[in-house]
From Swiss-Prot:
The lineage of its organism: Eukaryota, Fungi, Dikarya, Ascomycota, Pezizomycotina. It is found in: Cytoplasm; Nucleus. Belongs to the peptidase T1B family. Its main location: cytoplasm. Disulfide bonds: none annotated. It comes from the Eukaryota. The gene is pcb-4. This is Probable proteasome subunit beta type-4. One of its GO terms (cellular component) is cytosol. The 26S proteasome consists of a 20S proteasome core and two 19S regulatory subunits. The 20S proteasome core is composed of 28 subunits that are arranged in four stacked rings, resulting in a barrel-shaped structure. The two end rings are each formed by seven alpha subunits, and the two central rings are each formed by seven beta subunits. The catalytic chamber with the active sites is on the inside of the barrel. Keywords: Cytoplasm, Nucleus, Proteasome. One of its GO terms (molecular function) is endopeptidase activator activity. Pfam families: Proteasome. InterPro entries: Ntn_hydrolases_N, Proteasome_alpha, Proteasome_beta2, Proteasome_bsu_CS, Proteasome_sua/b, Proteasome_suB-type. PANTHER family: PROTEASOME SUBUNIT ALPHA/BETA.
Length: 203
């Protein structure tokens, strides 16, 4: 039931996650933050089995910060994506694999180029210009495919995200309680104010 969306642009990566923490058809929490900052320029959003998601996200966050403390430098988004993929692949071959789907995005601290990685519970890893997990895949990928281009600005990226969330409100029969939206730029991670109360008319 969770919604994850990611968009890259000229010099930024936007990651958005639905606020509703759900179990079946029941909403347990209406202000759940499904994102974790791994370092100053890398952000991860997660969905999946309730216990697995938070445990795996915090494990990844702790390992990223441990590396930074030991080596005096942060891992790049690409290095972190491959580390996460390796951990998921190892977990997949254990008796109790993590059931976690992830979007990992950031801006390289050296080249200042944005990147976004799509990972699923089977340890698949793909570098993509935009991505979605959950029900958002069915409704938003066509919109992103039509309107996205590599040189969009942050303002245009937020407008594109609005198009996606409007479509979800119009088509999905569930209330995902709005979105937590964050952007990663060369200056770090910033919270984006997002209008969750916008009423969308049916087509």
């Amino acid at each position: 039931m969770e919604v994850l969306l990611g968009i890259t642009g000229k010099d930024f990566t936007i990651i958005a996650a639905s606020k509703a923490a759900m179990r079946g058809a029941t909403i347990l929490k209406a202000s759940d933050d499904k994102t974790r900052s791994l370092n100053k320029h890398t952000l991860m959003a997660f969905s999946g089995e309730a216990g697995d998601t938070v445990q795996f996200a915090e494990y990844t966050q702790a390992n990223a910060q441990l590396y930074s403390m030991r080596n005096g430098t942060d891992l790049s988004p690409s290095a972190l994506a491959n580390f996460v993929r390796g951990e998921l692949a190892t977990s997949l071959r254990s008796r109790k694999p993590y059931n976690v789907n992830l979007l990992l995005g950031g801006v390289d601290p050296i080249t200042h180029k944005p990147s976004l990685y799509w990972l699923d519970y089977l340890a698949s890893l793909a570098k993509v210009p935009y991505a979605a997990h959950g029900y958002a895949q069915y409704y938003c990928l066509s919109i992103l495919d039509k309107h996205h281009h590599p040189d969009i600005t942050l303002h245009q990226g937020i407008k594109l995200l609005n198009l996606c969330t409007d479509e979800l409100k119009r088509r999905l029969p569930i209330d995902f309680k709005g979105m937590t939206v964050k952007a990663v730029t060369k200056d770090g991670i910033i919270d984006i104010e997002f209008d969750d109360d916008k009423v969308v008319k049916m087509a």
